[in-house]
Amino acid sequence: MLKMESTQQMASSIINTSFEAAVVAATSTLELMGIQYDYNEIYTRVKSKFDYVMDDSGVKNNLLGKAATIDQALNGKFGSVMRNKNWMTDSRTVAKLDEDVNKLRMMLSSKGIDQKMRVLNACFSVKRIPGKSSSVIKCTRLMKDKIERGAVEVDDSFVEEKMEVDTVDWKSRYDQLERRFESLKQRVNEKYTTWVQKAKKVNENMYSLQNVISQQQNQIADLQNYCSKLEADLQNKVGSLVSSVEWYLKSMELPDEVKTDIEQQLNSIDTISPINAIDDLEILIRNLIHDYDRTFLMFKGLLRQCNYEYAYE
């Protein structure tokens, strides 16, 4: 007992099976060609293209629509069947179908499929024999109709005709490939030579830069040695200066408090860092000048109190 939509389900199943067959054909072809592929990507691409072609061409809707018409007829509803019958026998429909056929023929011709190829494909088909390399050529109904109409001629005469076979001049092809290879080889050699020259120049610049850096490092080392020696000399000079002043101070007839104060200032001089030592010496000299100035003022005041005058000679 057929269901209400059994024909539509069968048509939908055929469409889905066609899609699966397209996926299998695509993947098997890639495997035979030795091309690695992603099955999910192939499945997605084929499905997208298949759905677009079936929907855009109207084939899917046409098949499902005819299946729906058959289901309606099986369920006793012949209205859609009669409309389709009237549409198929209408002169405008026939003219439209004839126009579509002509368009398809012109499209095939533009793709290089000429009339001979179209007629032969329409008149013959090839049946493969399982397990054998040979095959059987079958005549289609169109070929049978042509034979019945006398539209088929058999030429028994032997006519030697040159077969229109696309021959390949392998020697010229080989020469062409050899020239391309030599040209490519020359370009590669030129690029390699240019790269080698650039690499040599880079190496020369690098060696030159290394020499400059080495010279600068040597100069820096010499300056560091000179600075170290100069610093040591200054330390010795400062130490000698402090010792000489201390010795000289002890030979003076100054009060012990003054000697002690000056010795403390001498001992506070940094003999390790010449820069700090110079600052300490500056402070010591300033203090001595200040003390000398105070002593001079006291002496000047004392002379005035004694009604004496002073003069430098």
Curated annotation (Swiss-Prot):
Keywords: Coiled coil, Host cytoplasm, Host-virus interaction, RNA-binding, Translation regulation
GO terms for biological process, alphabetical: regulation of translation
Dimerization as annotated region, ranges: 150-206
Main location group: host cell
Region (Interaction with host ZC3H7B): 170-234
One Gene Ontology CC term in the entry: host cell cytoplasm
Subcellular location: Host cytoplasm
Name of the protein in question: Non-structural protein 3
